[in-house]
C-alpha cells in the first residue's frame, strides 16, 4: 500500500473557513474533479476514491488510454483519437474527441504541462482555433493533452 489521504471535518475548529464551504454535494464534486485530473496524468499509479466508505473509483495501473476510459467512462473509448507529435521544443501526446462528439461544454478539457494540470485561456484558445471551420463557433473542443517540455523554458 502506498499513500493514503483522508479528509474529515477539515474546518471543524475554524468556523471562519467553514462558512466558505458549499454543500457537501458540491464540495465532493470539487474533490472528484481534482481526483480525475490527478489520476488522468498518472496512469502508472493505482488510485482509490471512497466516499462514506463506498468505493467511487478503484483504478489500477494501466496504459494512458485505458486510464482515460476508466475515469471518463466506457463510452469515451469510441469518441477519442490518440495523438502524438514531437518537435525540438515540445512533445504533445494525448487524445482529442471526434468532432461529432463535441458540444458546448468545456467539461472534457484536460491540459497538462509536464504532467501538471493547468488552466490556460491562451492555450485553450489556440486549441479551439484548430477547430475553426470544422465545427460551429459555440462548440467547444474536448481533449486530454499532455505537453512535455524543458521546465527551464516555462513558468507555470
Where are the predicted features?
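N-terminal phosphate-binding caps/lids of nucleotide- and nucleic-acid-binding domains
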Residues: 1-155
Amino acid at each position: 500500500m502506498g499513500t493514503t489521504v483522508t479528509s474529515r471535518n477539515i474546518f471543524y475548529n475554524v468556523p471562519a473557513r467553514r462558512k466558505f464551504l458549499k454543500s457537501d454535494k458540491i464540495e465532493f464534486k470539487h474533490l472528484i474533479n481534482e481526483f480525475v485530473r490527478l489520476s488522468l496524468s498518472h496512469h502508472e499509479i493505482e488510485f482509490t476514491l471512497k466516499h462514506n466508505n463506498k468505493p467511487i473509483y478503484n483504478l489500477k495501473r494501466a496504459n494512458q488510454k485505458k486510464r482515460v476510459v476508466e475515469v471518463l467512462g466506457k463510452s469515451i473509448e469510441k469518441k477519442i483519437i490518440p495523438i502524438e507529435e514531437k518537435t525540438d521544443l515540445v512533445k504533445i501526446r494525448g487524445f482529442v474527441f471526434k468532432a461529432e462528439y463535441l458540444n458546448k461544454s468545456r467539461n472534457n478539457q484536460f491540459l497538462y504541462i509536464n504532467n501538471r494540470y493547468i488552466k490556460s485561456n491562451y492555450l485553450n484558445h489556440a486549441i479551439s482555433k484548430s477547430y475553426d471551420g470544422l465545427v460551429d463557433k459555440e462548440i467547444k473542443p474536448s481533449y486530454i493533452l499532455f505537453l512535455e517540455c524543458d521546465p527551464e523554458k516555462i513558468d507555470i
